Amino acid sequence: MPQVRAYACDDARSQYHPMIIDIREPGPGEVLFDIKYAGICHSDIHTARSEWGPIPYPFVGGHEIAGVVSKVGEGVTKFKVGDRIGVGCLQGSCKECEYCTDGHEQFCDNPHAYWTFRAGPDGKPTFGGYAQAMTVREDFACHVPDTVALEHAAPLMCAVITMYSPLRRWGAGPGKKVAIVGMGGLGHMGVQLAAAMGAEVSVISHGRSKEADARQFGATAFYATAEEGAIESLASSFDLIICTVSADDLDYLGLIRALKPFGVFVDVGLPENPMVIPMRAVVNGNKVVAGSQIGGIAETQEMLDFCAEHDVHPVIEIIDGDSITEAYDKVVASKVRYRFVIDTSTF
């Protein structure tokens, strides 16, 4: 069994540190690949710090992963040695239930989807992308187009599919007015994607410090909620609003009122506390309040191809392994523009 270098934490309060982990040889239908880059997602932080419940330690995070195939198992047809590969949140599902066969493997109910870290089908803990290699089922990996840099590909596997899926599902495109709430790791990609789809894009943020960036990414309007009357002025303005923030004091009612009749509000920010929205604001206008969770494997491949075709990519800061804990703290403090990506060659 190969051994590789990785970075792990030992409990909810520990620093990330180097360690050696075992990686299984690829079995039938599996590929082994060398991880080149791994993105840092806020859900890595929640998980590592046991904020979403207890987890097994040591914990190796990372579900935004890009690399190069080094070995293939028996019967593999999707990949060959040397192929560029991306892996996101999923490492397995039954592939037979109604959700899997419809291309929504993340909602597998037979018995459930298996996430990139936590535990595999055998019940044993699995390690994420903060490592130098990984073995994965070929049908839970995607091809990274040649025109997409691997360091850019890593965040595409979670942050970008999280935005791409609801934009596609709810019809962002020519003639549609789309608002992105928040200009962080998710939001800055939502602006680029919606603009590339042909929508008229606005950004709603607390202040104006990121307005120039938003316009460079393709936004045609910018609204700062810290300014008096900003949300109220947007009544009946948008066909689609995607909210990427988790602030408890966000004016959700004002955002619902900012929708046109038949408009859709999608939350991907996962606020910790319940959202309080008077249903009258939803019913009056036939509006929809929805959520969205990543995307299936086929849709993720579609997203990668779309980003390659339209030159959509994240703005990133590349860090080394010793900087992971510091990067976590910066993400929590919203001090990153716009996504940290770990270079595993520094391990």
Which role does the model predict for each range below?
Residues 78, 94-181:
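NAD(P)H dinucleotide-binding glycine-rich loop of Rossmann-like/cofactor-binding domains
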Residues 84, 177, 263-264, 288:
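Short glycine-centered segments of the SAM/dcSAM-binding site in methyltransferase folds
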Residues 174-183, 195-253:
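Adenosine-nucleotide cofactor-binding segment
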Residues 259-261:
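Helix-to-beta-strand junctions that scaffold the AdoMet/dcAdoMet cofactor pocket
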Residues 264-266, 277-317:
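Rossmann-fold dehydrogenase core element
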